[in-house]
Swiss-Prot record:
Binding site residues for Zn(2+): 568, 572, 669, 673
Keyword Cytoplasm: yes
Gene3D superfamilies per UniProt: 2.40.30.130, 3.10.310.40, 3.30.54.20, 6.10.250.550, Bira Bifunctional Protein, Domain 2, Threonyl-trna Synthetase, Chain A, domain 2
A GO cellular component annotation in the UniProt record: cytosol
Main location: cytoplasm
Listed name of the protein: Alanine--tRNA ligase
Keyword tags: Aminoacyl-tRNA synthetase, ATP-binding, Cytoplasm, Ligase, Metal-binding, Nucleotide-binding, Protein biosynthesis, RNA-binding, tRNA-binding, Zinc
Gene name of the encoded protein: alaS
């Protein structure tokens, strides 16, 4: 990665200004960037695109004073479905914080103006070579295609029609939908060709995922209303929504390939190097720090401080990730907050709040740094103690304590343990911790594999036929670097000339097992592809030394492989059943198959009902009971297509493919599978959920795991039945009876509380005192809830006719407070002000109307003093 020494022709600041100036000249209102915290969508964690602040306009629930708008929107993607945090800093274009250039038409102009202005801006203002630009359109969008080819003059060979490449009607990279129903329409994307020296093919080609052709601008034309049945109707007033990544455009205009080489990042990377003392400006940790200072500073400016929940937890994760990378560079004292001044200098003109909030941002980040550096030191002490004496495994309870009590990142614990040749026992982690572990592990493996450089021959895979093989070590790696040997305690990657280990692919995880060579023992924790035909065996040397050239006995873990193949074969049967029960529109969107379960994502626009789940389970288990043999045949693609085998949209296949037949299912698949369907044993769906618009997820278990799941449910039912003194078959009826009894008792309790309140109300009247002719009462009402307080208050107001009342009750340490003022006294005393005065003294707050208000508190020990203070408060106002 190069680092510019001169000012580029178009700085990031220039690009922002010229974009807004251009669209202002076209009659657009320049709209300021909205907060990173969406104000109109509680379901969205962060503003992740320019259109978020206009969502209500598109939905028809809001109307602006303008019909054309342009903005440069600050965006953040970290957390939720847009969680790419582990990739940030390791790829050329992944960021947490980024800026989105956009222009919008709310029922005004449409495709012709949008595309022509986009072309004019790119070629006339930014001076991009016309022969470097490509465009895509939705396959049926003849209007957009004609505008590109006949009016703008883009050669037809550089305008690509994109069909429904996501498995269902209108499920396309070039068809945008806000949700399952509602506004939608085709889009036209503009791509920039970085040149033949970069790998990758044009959009729509099998090689489109390469880095040569980069999407820079998307023009969305909202012209339809998606109906519940999947049909579309024209919108009365079509709209335009466009978005162009500022960082991507800057990389092109500044003639660099990575976003981290543009002027803003170049300056921030140098600032991070200054504060950490790192000399290598290409160090990925510096890129992480440079990215994260933007995200965290803008979040603080928008009111998001680090915490342990919601947006605050995402903020804390980002901050601590940056600090961890500084720690890796040897920085043991707070440094991150010192970059705020650099950021304010670089981006303060575009975002003035960075300057006005600079001191507050710096203070918040510094406090979090100081807290976490203290946590790091404590965590390291705990780790050192736990690993003393040659321990080979960090106990799961210790790892959980580090994470839960000290906020110690799980990946940091694992990093320290790997350096010492120690594994982490993750059994004690709950499901949320397991999910977090898998995400970090998957991201870490990807980065490591991509870093390995292997120029030798491919290995022979024998894992379809056998699970044990004699093989020769042809390469060894430690920390991504080729080595001649791996010694005891060292983690690394082993490449063999022949292997029975399956490498992670097609959703199936890689095999586990062991490599034995004399007294040397290498525990394989995972198997991943270095290249398509080169498998890397990831693990740790537990005994002896492995050398390049050694012969080893490679043994796959039989139990783990058996459980994994059961789940994989069941996934094929489930896919077939899903299409039969839900419809042929069902297409695979993603999968994860391991020894514990199978997770399958598929295209479908509605939740799968309980009855449908039962039908799917019945069909899969019927295939299992038939116990038919499976068959795998390698053939030409043309022959495979003739067999009717299912092929996944977007999947890359070679000239030779493997057709797998399992029961009535036939798919292309390179994974490992059972010999007969009966080997699966039992199939049970355990979860169904939505993961994105038009995408559902099913999770299922098989074999012993399915039996264990059902036995667990049985134990729960039996325990519940025992508690209710009923048999399992009587449980539902008994629960209904108990619920009826509870409702009856609740009514009785409410009636008794009302009687109690009435009797106490008479007694309380005697406690009222006079303040300048105004009756005032401030007292406890024992055993009352909020409803009883209100009812008693109403009765007191009826009886006394004129006065001010405060009633309070305590439940545990929680305080409920009611304040009431008769109609003739509200000009003197407001109930809302009075209840807040009392509530603040017991650690709470509240509100309401002038004549009645409620509040809560958390410090019951101060209630009596708070009630006594009412006399003085009313006296001041009477």
């Amino acid at each position: 990665m190069s680092h510019p020494t001169s000012t580029p022709a178009f700085t990031v600041a220039d690009i922002r200004k010229s974009f807004l100036d251009f669209f202002a000249s076209k009659g657009h209102t320049v709209v300021p960037s909205s907060s990173l915290v969406p104000g109109n969508d509680p379901t969205l964690m962060f503003t992740n695109s320019g259109m978020v602040q206009f969502k209500d306009v598109f939905l028809g629930t809001d109307k602006r004073s303008y019909v054309r708008a342009a903005s440069v929107q600050a965006c953040l993607r970290a957390g939720g479905k847009h969680n790419d945090l582990e990739n940030v800093g390791y790829t050329a274009r992944h960021h947490t914080f980024f800026e989105m250039l956009g222009n919008w038409s709310f029922g005004d102009y449409f495709k012709r103006e949008s595309l022509k202005w986009a072309w004019e801006l790119l070629t006339d203002v930014y001076k991009l070579p016309a022969d470097k630009l490509w465009a895509t359109v939705y396959i049926d969008d003849d209007e957009a295609y004609d505008i590109w080819t006949k009016e703008i003059g883009l050669p037809p060979e550089r305008v690509v029609r994109i069909g429904d490449n996501k498995g269902a009607k209108y499920a396309s990279d070039n068809f945008w939908m806000m949700a399952d129903t509602g506004p939608c329409g085709p889009c036209s994307e503009i791509f920039y060709d970085h040149g033949p020296e970069i790998a990758g093919g044009p959009p729509g080609s099998p090689e489109q995922d390469g880095d040569r052709y980069i999407e820079i601008w998307n023009n969305v034309f909202m012209q339809f209303d998606m109906q519940p049945d999947g049909s579309v109707k024209p919108l009365p007033a079509p709209c335009v929504d466009t978005g162009m990544g500022l960082e991507r455009l800057a990389a092109i205009l500044q003639h660099v390939h990575s976003n981290y080489e543009i002027d803003v990042f170049d300056a921030l990377i140098k600032a991070a190097a200054r504060e950490t003392g790192e000399k290598d400006l290409n160090n990925k940790s510096l890129r992480v720090i440079a990215d994260h200072i933007r995200a965290t500073a803008f979040l603080v400016s928008d009111g998001v401080n680090p915490s342990n929940e919601g947006r605050g937890y995402v903020q804390r994760r980002i901050i601590r990730r940056a600090i961890r990378h500084g720690y890796k560079l040897g920085k043991k004292t707070p440094f991150f907050h010192k970059l705020v001044a650099d950021l304010a200098r670089l981006m303060g003109d575009a975002y003035p709040k960075l300057r006005t909030d600079e001191a507050r941002i710096t203070a918040v980040l510094k406090a979090e740094e100081e807290r976490f550096f203290e946590t790091l030191e404590i965590g390291m002490t705990i780790l050192d103690t736990a690993l003393a004496g040659g321990a080979k495994v960090l106990p799961g309870d210790v790892a959980f304590k580090l994470h839960d009590t000290y906020g110690f990142p799980l990946d940091l614990s694992a990093d320290v343990c790997r350096e010492r040749g120690v594994d982490v026992d993750e059994t004690g982690f709950n499901a949320a911790m397991d999910r977090q572990k898998n995400q970090a592990r998957a991201a870490g493996k990807f980065k490591m594999d991509r870093a390995l450089e292997y120029a030798g021959s491919g290995n022979t895979f024998t894992g379809y036929e056998r699970l044990e093989e004699t093989a020769k070590i042809v390469a060894l790696y430690a920390d991504g670097v080729p080595v001649a040997a791996l010694t005891k305690g060292q983690s690394g990657v082993v490449v063999l000339d022949t292997t029975p280990f399956y490498a992670e692919s097609g959703g199936q995880v890689g095999d586990e097992g062991e490599l034995i060579s004399g007294s040397a023992h290498f525990a394989v924790g995972d198997t991943l592809k270095i290249k398509s035909d080169v498998y890397g065996h990831h693990g740790t040397v537990e005994q002896g030394t492995l050398n390049v050239g050694d012969h080893v006995n490679a043994r796959v873990n039989l139990a783990v492989r058996a459980a994994t193949v059961r789940n994989h074969s069941a996934t094929h049967l489930m896919h077939k059943a899903l299409r039969e029960v839900l419809g042929e529109h069902v297409q695979q969107k993603g999968s994860l198959v391991n020894a514990e379960r199978t997770r399958f994502d598929f295209a479908h626009n509605a939740p799968v009902t309980d009855d449908q789940i039962r039908e799917i389970e019945a069909r899969v288990n019927a295939e299992i009971l038939s116990n038919v043999a499976t068959d795998a045949s390698v053939m030409d693609m043309e022959a495979a297509q003739k067999t009717g085998a299912m092929m996944l949209f977007g999947e890359k296949y070679g000239d030779k493919v493997r057709v797998l037949s399992i029961g009535s299912s036939k798919e292309l698949c390179g994974g490992t599978h059972v010999t007969r369907t009966g080997d699966i044993g039992l199939f049970k769906i355990v979860a169904e959920s939505g993961v994105a618009a038009g995408v559902r997820r099913v999770e299922a278990v098989t074999g012993e795991n399915a039996l264990a799941y059902l036995q667990s449910l049985e134990s729960t039912v039996q325990a519940a039945a025992g508690s209710l003194k009923a048999s399992p078959t009587e449980l539902q009826q008994r629960i209904g009876q108990v619920l009826d009894q509870v409702k009856s008792l609740e009514k009785e309790i409410a009636a008794l509380k009302g009687k109690l309140a009435s009797s106490q109300g008479d007694e309380l009247m005697a406690q009222a005192f006079d303040v300048k002719g105004l009756k005032v009462l401030a007292a406890r009402l024992e055993g009352a809830d909020a409803r009883t307080l209100r009812e008693t208050m109403d009765k007191l107001k009826d009886k006394l006719k004129t006065g001010v009342f405060v009633l309070a009750a305590v439940d545990g340490n929680k305080v409920q407070i009611a304040a009431g003022v008769t109609a003739d006294s509200v000009t003197v005393v407001k109930a809302g002000e009075l209840v807040n005065f009392v509530a603040q003294q017991v650690g709470g707050k509240g509100g309401g109307k002038a004549d009645m208000a409620m509040a809560g508190g958390t410090d019951a020990s101060r209630l009596d003093d708070a009630l006594k203070s009412v006399r003085a408060w009313v006296t001041e106002r009477a």
